[in-house]
Design a protein with these regions (language model features):
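Cysteine-dependent hydrolase recognition
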Residues: 1-262
Length: 262
C-alpha cells in the first residue's frame, strides 16, 4: 500500500474521470434527487463535462444484477473518483433489490423469494409460515422450502451485492472512492469494505466511509469541486464530514490544480 501511495504522489494527475453510482433504496429512489446531484456535480466540476474528460452515471436500474458492471467499472484504469450511494454493511455494498417488472410471473417469484427469506432459518418455520399466510393472504405453496430453493436464493443474494470476499485480489482502481452508505467504513472491525478497496492490488489509495449508520438527507458531494482545485482530500473532508464519516487511507493525496489562471 505504501509503495502505491508514493507512486501516486509522484504523478501529475488531473481529476478528469468520474464514476457515480446509485443503489436501490437510496434517497427513496427519487429521480429528482438523482437528477439534482448530476446538476450539482456539473456546477462544481465543469471541466469534467467538457471534451477530453469522462463522467459516467449508473443507476441500479441500469442493469440487473448490477454487480458485474460495477466491479468492471471499478477495475478500469484511469478512474480518478468514484461516488457510491447505496445501503451498506461492514462487509457488503447493497446494490440491487428484487428484479423490477410489471409481469405477473416476476411479481409472484419476488413474493415467493421474500416469503422464503422470512421462513428459512427461523426457529419455528411452521409457525412463521402460518403467520405469513394469515398476514399476507398468500397460498401455502408460495412458502415452500427445499434445499434447491435455498441454494438458488443464496446464489441470487450473492449475485446482487458486492461482498467483501469479492474484493480479495480484485483491483479497485479509482484513486478515491466515497461510500455514501452505512457501515462500509467500519474501521474498528477486522475488515470492512472501505479498507478492502485500498489494501487490494488496485490503484485506490483513499476511501471515505461511515463507521455506523449514515444520514441520507444530506449533501454528500458538498465542496467536491475543491478537489479539482488541488485541495488535498483530507482538507476537503474536514469541511464535509459528519461524526460517523472517516477517511481511510491517505488524506494528503490531491489532484493537480486545474483552476489556476491559464
Amino acid at each position: 500500500y505504501l509503495r502505491k501511495v508514493v507512486k501516486a504522489h509522484a504523478e501529475q494527475n488531473e481529476l478528469d474521470n468520474l464514476f457515480v453510482f446509485r443503489g436501490h433504496g437510496y434517497n427513496s429512489e427519487a429521480p429528482e434527487a438523482w437528477a439534482g446531484e448530476q446538476i450539482a456535480l456539473r456546477e462544481q466540476l465543469p471541466a469534467l463535462f467538457r471534451t477530453g474528460s469522462t463522467v459516467r452515471f449508473y443507476d441500479f436500474e441500469s442493469r440487473w444484477p448490477m454487480k458485474p458492471y460495477l466491479l468492471e467499472k471499478m477495475a478500469r484504469k484511469g478512474v480518478d473518483v468514484a461516488l457510491c450511494h447505496h445501503h451498506g454493511a461492514p462487509d457488503t455494498q447493497y446494490l440491487n433489490g428484487y428484479r423490477n417488472g410489471s409481469g405477473m410471473n416476476v411479481s409472484i417469484e419476488n413474493i415467493k423469494r421474500f416469503l422464503r427469506s422470512k421462513i428459512d432459518g427461523h426457529k419455528d418455520p411452521e409457525k412463521r409460515k402460518a403467520e405469513l399466510i394469515a398476514y399476507y393472504g398468500v397460498p401455502e405453496a408460495w412458502c415452500q422450502l427445499s434445499d434447491s430453493l435455498h441454494t438458488a436464493d443464496s446464489l441470487l443474494d450473492q449475485a446482487m451485492d458486492v461482498h467483501i470476499e469479492d474484493l480479495y485480489n480484485r483491483p479497485m482502481n479509482p484513486r478515491m472512492v466515497m461510500f455514501d452508505a452505512c457501515y462500509n467504513g467500519s474501521f474498528h472491525l477486522d475488515e470492512c469494505i472501505a479498507a478492502s478497496y485500498i489494501f487490494g492490488p488496485g490503484d485506490c489509495i483513499v476511501t471515505q466511509g461511515n463507521s455506523v449508520n449514515a444520514l441520507q438527507d444530506k449533501w454528500p458531494d458538498r465542496y467536491i469541486g475543491l478537489l479539482d482545485c488541488g485541495v488535498r482530500i483530507g482538507q476537503w473532508g474536514r469541511h464535509v464530514h459528519y461524526l460517523e464519516t472517516h477517511l481511510i487511507g491517505d488524506p494528503t493525496y490531491r489532484f493537480i490544480n486545474r483552476a489556476l489562471p491559464g
